[in-house]
Amino acid sequence: MGNGSVKPKHSKHPDGQSGNLSNEALRSKVAELEREVKRKDAELQEREYHLKELREQLAKQTVAIAELTEELQSKCIQLNKLQDVIHVQGGSPLQASPDKVPLDVHRKTSGLVSLHSRRGAKAGVSAEPTSRTYDLNKPPEFSFEKARVRKDSSEKKLITDALNKNQFLKRLDPQQIKDMVECMYGRNYQQGSYIVKQGEPGNHIFVLAEGRLEVFQGEKLLSSIPMWTTFGELAILYNCTRTASVKAITNVKTWALDREVFQNIMRRTAQARDEEYRNFLRSVSLLKNLPEDKLTKIIDCLEVEYYDKGDYIIREGEEGSTFFILAKGKVKVTQSTEGHDQPQLIKTLQKGEYFGEKALISDDVRSANIIAEENDVACLVIDRETFNQTVGTFDELQKYLEGYVATLNRDDEKRHAKRSMSSWKLSKALSLEMIQLKEKVARFSSTSPFQNLEIIATLGVGGFGRVELVKVKNENIAFAMKCIRKKHIVDTKQQEHVYSEKRILEELCSPFIVKLYRTFKDNKYVYMLLEACLGGELWSILRDRGSFDEPTSKFCVACVTEAFDYLHRLGIIYRDLKPENLILDADGYLKLVDFGFAKKIGSGQKTWTFCGTPEYVAPEVILNKGHDFSVDFWSLGILVYELLTGNPPFSGIDQMMTYNLILKGIEKMDFPRKITRRPEDLIRRLCRQNPTERLGNLKNGINDIKKHRWLNGFNWEGLKARSLPSPLRRELSGPIDHSYFDKYPPEKGVPPDEMSGWDKDF
């Protein structure tokens, strides 16, 4: 410019330059981070994919392990059975598969059979009966207050935690655990002494409080027992022989509980609960006139639900199908009223009061709100569907109470009289034959039965004694003589069970139950003279074949169902169903034998003694909840499974494991392919964990089993009339042909005299 001025150059402001550089750096950093995120995402996806693969592999391996475990267990049982068959065939190689062993294999080879062939047979177990009328040394009446032992709160907590860690005990009710803790008492042992000794009977459960214990089998060390661990729990269920020894390595302190105290606690808490629930139900106008058996079923269906303060149990205007009884706490009842924006308090309900009872009759639109007034409110709940399935609809119950059912039954009997005439004639013929034989044996000496009878062969042996095939001297009339060692009965406190078997069998006359003709006794034995059924044991045939086809299984199940129908009508529960207790008569029809665990109970009543065969006992027996006829339906489901597969569904390496498997239930169990859909459905419905949900124990009773689709088309009338050919019939050469039974060695030694007098009325 003319004035010499110079135009300044444009220059970047230092701050602007810094800002641009900063933005570029950020963009670069973001790009780098994005690349890193993508890399990490790819890496994460790869790891997730790898993890998914590992999970799938783990799931497959878990399934494979479960299948292999089940298969191994099955193979072990099957191995025993195959070894038994080898013994049956005199050690020769098997010529046929287990499914194709002919029915008469036993007949051809029975002379070669030894006691080894009994190895797979299942044995029954029993605690002392709760009613020990014939036990001259029975203890005094149980008193919970006298059984309690003082402990501080920290000891109680440690014992409670130890019991709750145990696989079996953790399933008991909290109140039962609490009572057990109260009654456990201290037992101290010196170093080197035995707390439990292998081979000796057990009577206590223990919790280790101080010291060190080791478990031995023979001379072999198996394990050590950690502090505050429970052991010996099987002994509180029933009288059993210890399978291992527990030795004190140091001085030891334990807490112990006796079997008798445990069983009294279980019975006491369950009976108290049932009585409380029964009183609640008797206060409900809709239910107060129901008979005891219906009330008992409702009690067993009740579930406990808990609510905290402010929780709505029922909302006004909602439809409901559930009935509630307040078991603990308080609730308030509020209702919408004209002129108020908020529902108004109507009243407060307390323990023992109920609401929602109209829901048992039909869908009920709730007319008020029911709200918990405090924490831990407990309600007993039953819904209409459960109520209807278990005891019937309200209309059905009304008819029942008015006597309409009795009228309908009489009309039904008239309608079916002609159809049932053949089975009535058969029953009459059986009764006449039984009377004639009873008259004959009534003349025999009551203390010397073998003056008139001679032993032909041994049909069976057991812990109790032996069963001998006998015949009347100089006559072609045969019987089975059950010889029970009196000393064994006293030692195991089973006097009540023996008397119960006698009383029950004397009352029965059914073509599906073995007949009792006479009893005898001497200084060493009590005897039962029974019907001789010489077609063999169902267990032996199942052992030889491996499993049965469906038609044969249906026939067996039908025979048992008829036997149960007859027994349950008389108020008798059987409690020991298994193939070992089913025997074939000359026509191949099955009969129930061994009524040592059978018991007569009143309508709506329960019984408490732990008894049965481990693989067949129902969950409520294991948990000492009290049981009734529904245990027989459970065992029928187990029998169906064993007939079709050759093995029961629950079988552990020891009895306690078997019980824990039973308590886990059958619902989630995978069935083998040889059990088809229909029998599987029957088994699952018979083996429901809740007794009130079992087929046979619903409102239609045992008819639900007979009408199950697996048994569709079965000829029940032909079975009852014995005109239906048996798939298990075998030829007999005469009344003393015992060729279908295993051969047993002579009894070793002579049992001692037992003269306490418990059998004076036998």
Curated annotation (Swiss-Prot):
GO terms for cellular component: apical plasma membrane; nuclear membrane; plasma membrane. InterPro entries: AGC-kinase_C (IPR000961), cGMP_dep_kinase (IPR002374), cNMP-bd_CS (IPR018488), cNMP-bd_dom (IPR000595), cNMP-bd_dom_sf (IPR018490), Kinase-like_dom_sf (IPR011009), Prot_kinase_dom (IPR000719), Protein_kinase_ATP_BS (IPR017441). It is found in: Apical cell membrane; Cell membrane. 3',5'-cyclic GMP 2 binds at residues 347, 356-359, 366-367, 412, 415. GO terms for molecular function: ATP binding; cGMP binding; cGMP-dependent protein kinase activity; identical protein binding; mitogen-activated protein kinase binding; protein serine kinase activity. Its EC number is 2.7.11.12. Binding of cGMP results in enzyme activation. Keywords: ATP-binding, Cell membrane, cGMP, cGMP-binding, Kinase, Lipoprotein, Membrane, Myristate, Nucleotide-binding, Phosphoprotein, Serine/threonine-protein kinase, Transferase. Its main location: membrane. It comes from the Eukaryota. Residues 168-283, 286-416 are annotated as: cGMP-binding, high affinity. The modification Phosphoserine is found at residues 110, 117, 431. The modification Phosphothreonine is found at residue 609. Residues 712-762 form the AGC-kinase C-terminal domain. It is a lipid-anchor. A lipid is attached at residue 2 (N-myristoyl glycine). Residues 453-711 form the Protein kinase domain. 3',5'-cyclic GMP 1 binds at residues 232-235, 242-243. Crucial regulator of intestinal secretion and bone growth. Phosphorylates and activates CFTR on the plasma membrane. Plays a key role in intestinal secretion by regulating cGMP-dependent translocation of CFTR in jejunum. Acts downstream of NMDAR to activate the plasma membrane accumulation of GRIA1/GLUR1 in synapse and increase synaptic plasticity. Acts as regulator of gene expression and activator of the extracellular signal-regulated kinases MAPK3/ERK1 and MAPK1/ERK2 in mechanically stimulated osteoblasts. Belongs to the protein kinase superfamily. AGC Ser/Thr protein kinase family. cGMP subfamily. PANTHER family: CYCLIC NUCLEOTIDE-DEPENDENT PROTEIN KINASE (PTHR24353), PTHR24353:SF24. This is cGMP-dependent protein kinase 2.
